[in-house]
Amino acid sequence: MSHNSFGHLFRVTTWGESHGLALGCVVDGCPPGITFTEAEIQSFLDKRKPGQSKYTTQRREPDQVRVLSGVLLGEDGVTMTTTGTPISMMIENTDQRSKDYGEIARQYRPGHADYAYDVKYGIRDYRGGGRSSARETAARVAAGAIARKVVPGLEVRGALVSIGAHDIDRSRWNWAEVDNNPFFTPDAGSVEVFADYLDGIRKNGSSVGAIIEIVAEGVPAGIGAPIYGKLDQDIASYLMSINAVKGVEIGNGFEAARLTGEENADEMRMGNDGKPIFLSNHAGGVLGGIATGAPVVARFAVKPTSSILTPRRSINKDGNEVDVMTRGRHDPCVGIRAVPIGEAMVACAIADHYLRHRGQTGRV
């Protein structure tokens, strides 16, 4: 199985499966001299890890990261400095229950990658989905923590903006609320609505999708490239690579098709500091594939988890028709834990373009 790496200069390879002994990543191309601690990486992994509320899978993994290479440990025994060599990080799996998946070893879950993997490879790891499991994304979050350090002043934040047909009230958007509730939503007024809705979904053994918005501030104007190397192109590609993501939009996205040219254009003026400012940000911080200096805004849609208790019609590996009902521990809304994953992927895309821009132009 190939295609386990992404990026050009800031290149990330992830490895491991849902029910293997461990998973991890190798970050190649990280510049030397960047300092960080394992605790900083852990803080992002803790946002993604399972078992933190009744609205996510009850699989309990500490997701404790270990940095194995590519750094020098400082005299304080905590601070690490990158050497420019590959940074390898590992996260052990400690709460696998492979016996829960015995019934689906030869069955294809509708909406899951089971059938597609079998068609391509002739074999699949049915235990928790193997490589197609969202468990793999823990490694991406670790890589994203390093990526945030590459671009000076970069801040990447994400929030859940809808679950099913329930949207937040954007007039109540408050970033400070995101870490104060189990849904990573910026609208405190939506917490009870989401909770009541997901309680019903969870009790019925069903699942539901979500939409997540990522905002990156401090993105240097000029990074990116035209035509086939666009910044927004790569952000979309990185986000689409996340398990269960079925759609991505940048800035106004599909809504731009409903606007006139006058409504959609981001007008400009000179700021008091003598630098250009945009009076709106319909473009989501990218024009012609190149960052404008405005916040980069992306949204992605996550489909409902395929593993549900409701019997669904399918077939098995022998070609027999079966009804599939998935047991085990699963997220009623996998979109909740996709928030830190989306942040990580956007950070990796920006870090890669930052290094490419610096290498091509000598400017940042």
UniProtKB/Swiss-Prot annotation:
Q: Which Gene3D superfamilies match?
A: Chorismate synthase AroC (3.60.150.10)
Signal peptide residues are none
Q: Which GO terms describe its biological process?
A: amino acid biosynthetic process; aromatic amino acid family biosynthetic process; chorismate biosynthetic process
Q: Name one GO cellular component term.
A: cytosol
Q: So which cofactors does this thing need?
A: FMNH2
Q: How is the cofactor bound?
A: Reduced FMN (FMNH(2)).
Q: What is its EC number?
A: 4.2.3.5
InterPro entries to which the protein is assigned, alphabetical: Chorismate_synth, Chorismate_synth_AroC_sf, Chorismate_synthase_CS
UniProt keyword list:
Amino-acid biosynthesis, Aromatic amino acid biosynthesis, FAD, Flavoprotein, FMN, Lyase, NADP
Quote the record's binding site residues for NADP(+).
R48
Q: Can you list the disulfide-bonded cysteine pairs?
A: none
Give the binding site residues for FMN.
R131, S132, S133, N243, A244, G288, K303, P304, T305, S306, S307, R329
Please list the reactions this protein catalyses. Answer: 5-O-(1-carboxyvinyl)-3-phosphoshikimate = chorismate + phosphate
Name any one GO molecular function: chorismate synthase activity
User: Mind telling me which Pfam families this protein's record contains?
Assistant: Chorismate_synt
* UniProt pathway: Metabolic intermediate biosynthesis; chorismate biosynthesis; chorismate from D-erythrose 4-phosphate and phosphoenolpyruvate: step 7/7
Please name the top-level EC class of this enzyme: lyase
Q: How does it assemble?
A: Homotetramer.
Role of this protein: This reaction introduces a second double bond into the aromatic ring system.
The family database entries (NCBIfam families) matched by this protein are listed as:
aroC, PRK05382.1
Please state which protein family the record places this protein in: Belongs to the chorismate synthase family.
This chain's protein is named: Chorismate synthase
Species of origin: Brucella melitensis biotype 2 (strain ATCC 23457)
Upper taxonomic lineage: Bacteria, Pseudomonadati, Pseudomonadota, Alphaproteobacteria, Hyphomicrobiales
Name of the gene encoding the protein in the UniProt record: aroC
